[in-house]
Regions:
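Active-site SXXK
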Residues: 71-74, 88, 94, 118-145, ...
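Short, gly/Ser/Thr-rich active-site loops of penicillin-recognizing serine hydrolases
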Residues: 373-439, 443
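Short, conserved catalytic-motif segment at the N-terminal edge
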Residues: 61-121, 141-146, 189, 198, ...
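Short, well-ordered beta-strand elements
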Residues: 347-348, 358-375, 488-489, 498-504
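Short solvent-exposed beta->alpha transition segments
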Residues: 425-471
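Short, surface-exposed loop or secondary-structure junction motifs
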Residues: 102-107, 159-353, 358
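Exposed beta-sheet edge and beta->alpha loop/turn motif
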Residues: 465-506
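Short, low-complexity, charge-dense intrinsically disordered segments
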Residues: 1-17, 21-28, 32, 37-40, ...
C-alpha cells in the first residue's frame, strides 16, 4: 500500500519565514516563536491526507504506527534545527508505503514542499556515478581492475597502481579538493585534473581508506573518456530516462527548472540563502544532481531488479572494500555498507550548498528510508537514525539533551582537535604538557574511525553540557552515527589550553 501525503497550498505557511531559523536570548519570545512554528507546521501537515493506493502491498498496523513516529521525528527535527522543508519516502520491496512533504521549498516565495520538489542531493549522487561505471563494466567497455593511467597517460608516476576499483571504493590515496581549487571559479575537466595531479597521495593505493571527492570527479572524467559523453548525459541516457526519473538531472543555476527547492543555512541564528559556487564545481560526478523524492523512489525500485544493474553488478557495488592487508572497510561503490543491530544496511548521505540528504536501505527487511532537506543545519546522520528507530527501536538515539551552543569558538576548537585525533596527528600546543602522555591518541582515533564517515560526524557534533570544575571549564559534545554514539569531554584551562580529553561510548 502507499500512504500518500498531498500537501495543499495554504496561507498558514506564511508563519514560517518570520520565525524559522531565529534564536533569541529572550525566553518568552523564544517560547512564542516555537509555538508559532509548531502551529505553522501542524497546519501544513494537517493538510496532508493519508490514503491507500490502488496497487501495492496492504497496509499493516505496524506501518501505521511507524508512520506516526516518523511524523513526530520529522516535526521535532524541523523545530530543533530550523529546517525549512523536508521531503520523505519510505518503501518496502520497492513499493512506497509512506510519502510525505513538510514545510517550505522556498521561504521567500512561500512555496511548500511537494513530492515533485527537487533538491540538491549532494553525495547521494556518487551511487549514480558508480552505477554508470558498472554499466560500462557490464558492457565490457571498462574493467574494475584497469589502471587509470591507461586513460590518463599524463598522470603522475605515483598514480600508476590506481585502478578503477580504487576510485570507486575510496582506496586510491587521492584526497579531497586541493587548496588551489576555488569553488567560486570555473574549471574545465583538464584544469581540474591538472590540480589533482599536483597533490601527493595520502597513502599507497589499496593500503588504506579515505573518503575522496576527487576520486569520484575523476570517475566522471573517465566516463567521458570511455564513452565520449559527459557523465550527466550518460546518466540521462542510461539511467534516468529508462527508469522514468523525469526530474533527475545535473545541477544548473542558469536553467529554468520547475519545482526547484532553495537551500538555506543559519548565520548567527538567522536564516540565509545557500552560498554560491561556480557552475563547473556544481556539475562534477562527486555529487551534483537534482533529485526529487519521486526520482529516488523509482531508483530504489530499480535496485530490486536487474535493470539497469545486474545482480552480479549490485553484489559488487554492495561488497565492502578489502585492503591489501586483508582488512575490510565499510564502503563499496558509492554506498556505505553497515551491519548494525542485527540488520545489514547500505546507506549514503549528501551535504552540499544548503541541502542535506540521506538514503538508508535495510537489505534484510527490504525497507528503504529516503529524506531530502533544504537546510545545512540538518544533523542528517542523527535524523536518519531517528527515522530508522521509528521502524526498529534498537536504533533509538541516546537519551541526551542537546543544549544551545553559546560558545561556537570552543565547538570549533573541539572539532579541530577531534579531526587531528582522527588522522593520528595532534597539535601539542593546544594541550597542557601532561595531557598527551595520559591520553592514547590511537585509542581515540580507533573510536572515531569506527564511524561510517568520521569527518562529517565530527562536524555535526552537538553541545550537551557545560560545567566548571577546579577553575576549569568542562564541555561535553555528542557525536552520533547510524548505530553508535560517543561523548567527547574536554576540560579547558583559564588560558584556553586543553587539560583533559576523553571520548567514551554511550
Amino acid at each position: 500500500m502507499v500512504l500518500l501525503c498531498d500537501l495543499c497550498v495554504s496561507a498558514p505557511s506564511a508563519f514560517i519565514p518570520q520565525y524559522i531559523g531565529k534564536y533569541t536570548r529572550d525566553s518568552e519570545r523564544e517560547t512564542l516563536n516555537r509555538k508559532l512554528v509548531v502551529l505553522a507546521l501542524t497546519i501544513i501537515v494537517y493538510c496532508c491526507s493519508i490514503t491507500p493506493a490502488r496497487q501495492g502491498e496492504s497496509s499493516t498496523k505496524e506501518d501505521r504506527a511507524a508512520a506516526t513516529r516518523v511524523d513526530r521525528v520529522v516535526k521535532e527535527a524541523m523545530l530543533t534545527y530550523k529546517i525549512p522543508g523536508v521531503s520523505l519516502a519510505v518503501l518496502r520491496n520497492g513499493q512506497i508505503i509512506l510519502l510525505k512533504s513538510y514545510g517550505l521549498a522556498n521561504v521567500e516565495h512561500q512555496i511548500p514542499v511537494k513530492p515533485e520538489t527537487i533538491f540538491q542531493s549532494g553525495s547521494i549522487g556518487k551511487q549514480f556515478t558508480a552505477a554508470a561505471i558498472m554499466i560500462l563494466v557490464q558492457e565490457n567497455k571498462l574493467s574494475l581492475d584497469a589502471k587509470i593511467s591507461r586513460y590518463f597517460p599524463d598522470s603522475p608516476a605515483a598514480w600508476k597502481d590506481i585502478t578503477v576499483w580504487n576510485l570507486l571504493t575510496h582506496t586510491s590515496g587521492l584526497g579531497d579538493y586541493p587548496p588551489e581549487i576555488d569553488l567560486r571559479r570555473d574549471y574545465t575537466e583538464d584544469e581540474f585534473f591538472a590540480a589533482f595531479k599536483k597533490a601527493p597521495l595520502d597513502f599507497a593505493p589499496g593500503t588504506n581508506w579515505n573518503y575522496s571527492n576527487v576520486g569520484y570527479v575523476t570517475l566522471g572524467i573517465l566516463i567521458r573518456k570511455v564513452t565520449g559523453k559527459y557523465y550527466g548525459d550518460f546518466l540521462q541516457e542510461r539511467i534516468f530516462k529508462p527508469l522514468g526519473m523525469t526530474t533527475a538531472r545535473v545541477i544548473s543555476e542558469e536553467d529554468i527548472i520547475p519545482n526547484r527547492a532553495s537551500g538555506y543555512r543559519l548565520v548567527k541564528g538567522q536564516l540565509k540563502n545557500q552560498e554560491w559556487v561556480s557552475p563547473s564545481t556544481n556539475s562534477t560526478a562527486d555529487g551534483s544532481l537534482y533529485l526529487s523524492i519521486l526520482d529516488l523512489a523509482k531508483w530504489d525500485a530499480a535496485l530490486h531488479t536487474d535493470t539497469p544493474l545486474t545482480q552480479a553488478s549490485r553484489n559488487k557495488i554492495w561488497t565492502p572494500a578489502q585492503l591489501s592487508d586483508g582488512t575490510t572497510k565499510g564502503y563499496g561503490f558509492g554506498w556505505h555498507i553497515l551491519n548494525l543491530h542485527g540488520h545489514r544496511l547500505i546507506v549514503h548521505g549528501g551535504a552540499w550548498q544548503g541541502f542535506k540528504t540521506h538514503i538508508l536501505r535495510f537489505m534484510d527487511t527490504k525497507l528503504t528510508i529516503v529524506f531530502l532537506t533544504n537546510s545545512w543545519e540538518t544533523r542528517d546522520f542523527k535524523f536518519a537514525r531517528a527515522l530508522a528507530a521509528s521502524f526498529y527501536p534498537s536504533f533509538a538515539l541516546p537519551d541526551v539533551n542537546v543544549i544551545p551552543d553559546t560558545d561556537p569558538k570552543m565547538t570549533s576548537l573541539v572539532r579541530r582537535v577531534l579531526m587531528q585525533f582522527n588522522v593520528g596527528k595532534v597539535d601539542e600546543q593546544l594541550f597542557t604538557p601532561d595531557v598527551l602522555r595520559l591520553v592514547s591518541i590511537k585509542a581515540i582515533q580507533n573510536k572515531l574511525n569506527a564511524f561510517s564517515l568520521p569527518v562529517a560526524i565530527i562536524n555535526s557534533s552537538e553541545l550537551v553540557g557545560i560545567s566548571h570544575e577546579n577553575n576549569e571549564r568542562v564541555y561535553r559534545y555528542l557525536l552520533t552515527d547510524f548505530g553508535s554514539s560517543l561523548v567527547c569531554t574536554v576540560k579547558l584551562t583559564q588560558d584556553g589550553r586543553i587539560s583533559a580529553i576523553e571520548v567514551s561510548s554511550i
